[in-house]
Amino acid sequence: MTDAPVISPIDQARILSEALPHMQRYDEETIVIKYGGHAMGAENDAKAFARDIVLLEQTAVNPVVVHGGGPQIATMLKRLGIKSEFAAGLRITDGATIEIVEMVLAGSINKQLVGYINEAGGKAVGLCGKDGNMVTASKATRTMVDPDSRIEEVVDLGFVGEPEKVDLTLLNQLIGHELIPVLAPLATSATGQTFNVNADTFAGAVAGALKAKRLLLLTDVPGVLDKSKQLIPELSIKDARKLIADGTISGGMIPKVETCIYALEQGVEGVVILDGKVPHAVLLELFTNQGTGTLIHK
């Protein structure tokens, strides 16, 4: 690891001065940040992310953090001798698995991230979509083509949910009051059943309900790539749909982009897919001229 470059006091002042108009743009605005399990990395990376979130709050931005936890769930399931199974990019979640998912997301990752933010000087509040019936969901359904028969079949994903409604009562008590909501992507059904919700989908639903200024999806790739594997810095909804249709956007990037489109259609001003492993990725996107990742807009 190389030492960080030394920045003179004058250059530090210049950087802060150049950030001012960007800070003013997001003054008192709500930014929803999805912090993916793959983006979390080592403890030092998570603590650096937490400090950046506190900095946002200190500059009058209202951050709302939604975290994932796929790798951490997989590690716990493996430790307990439970096989991880996926269909259509979603974890098949049976009765035993949903208990472990809830334990890891709401009990471990959530409280750890809350601790890091509080350690950095913030006031984080750890919640999940079940708290206050914040996010209600219904059972998710997916279809897949059987490779042998070529017949499309419905896949039973178990306790995997799709958000149906977001109740902002609880979040509105926190946002704008120097409190930073940290949300685990769990939801409840109308009958009280716990559902595991894809973190991107959960973040998109929350951002849409809040009419957030920005939704940032932190992942482990630079953003949306073209067929030459070069970053596409900006896309409209129309452009994004074309790239899905022609196969440029494929695999796991499709549901991420579909989440972006949904959030935009619900009133979010802009959505960015960016590499959360880049140091200070959130600050680079919000407070610099060039930004980072792929911005998707109407």
Swiss-Prot record:
<keyword id="KW-0067">ATP-binding</keyword>
<protein>
    <recommendedName>
        <fullName>Acetylglutamate kinase</fullName>
        <ecNumber>2.7.2.8</ecNumber>
    </recommendedName>
</protein>
<dbReference type="InterPro" id="IPR037528">
    <property type="entry name" value="ArgB"/>
</dbReference>
<dbReference type="InterPro" id="IPR004662">
    <property type="entry name" value="AcgluKinase_fam"/>
</dbReference>
<dbReference type="GO" id="GO:0006526">
    <property type="term" value="P:L-arginine biosynthetic process"/>
</dbReference>
<keyword id="KW-0028">Amino-acid biosynthesis</keyword>
<dbReference type="InterPro" id="IPR001048">
    <property type="entry name" value="Asp/Glu/Uridylate_kinase"/>
</dbReference>
<keyword id="KW-0808">Transferase</keyword>
<dbReference type="GO" id="GO:0003991">
    <property type="term" value="F:acetylglutamate kinase activity"/>
</dbReference>
<dbReference type="Pfam" id="PF00696">
    <property type="entry name" value="AA_kinase"/>
</dbReference>
<feature type="binding site">
    <location>
        <position position="196"/>
    </location>
    <ligand>
        <name>substrate</name>
    </ligand>
</feature>
<keyword id="KW-0963">Cytoplasm</keyword>
<comment type="function">
    <text>Catalyzes the ATP-dependent phosphorylation of N-acetyl-L-glutamate.</text>
</comment>
<keyword id="KW-0055">Arginine biosynthesis</keyword>
<keyword id="KW-0547">Nucleotide-binding</keyword>
<dbReference type="GO" id="GO:0005524">
    <property type="term" value="F:ATP binding"/>
</dbReference>
<feature type="binding site">
    <location>
        <position position="91"/>
    </location>
    <ligand>
        <name>substrate</name>
    </ligand>
</feature>
<dbReference type="GO" id="GO:0005737">
    <property type="term" value="C:cytoplasm"/>
</dbReference>
<comment type="pathway">
    <text>Amino-acid biosynthesis; L-arginine biosynthesis; N(2)-acetyl-L-ornithine from L-glutamate: step 2/4.</text>
</comment>
<feature type="site" description="Transition state stabilizer">
    <location>
        <position position="34"/>
    </location>
</feature>
<dbReference type="InterPro" id="IPR041727">
    <property type="entry name" value="NAGK-C"/>
</dbReference>
<feature type="binding site">
    <location>
        <begin position="69"/>
        <end position="70"/>
    </location>
    <ligand>
        <name>substrate</name>
    </ligand>
</feature>
<dbReference type="GO" id="GO:0042450">
    <property type="term" value="P:arginine biosynthetic process via ornithine"/>
</dbReference>
<keyword id="KW-0418">Kinase</keyword>
<feature type="site" description="Transition state stabilizer">
    <location>
        <position position="256"/>
    </location>
</feature>
<dbReference type="InterPro" id="IPR036393">
    <property type="entry name" value="AceGlu_kinase-like_sf"/>
</dbReference>
<comment type="similarity">
    <text>Belongs to the acetylglutamate kinase family. ArgB subfamily.</text>
</comment>
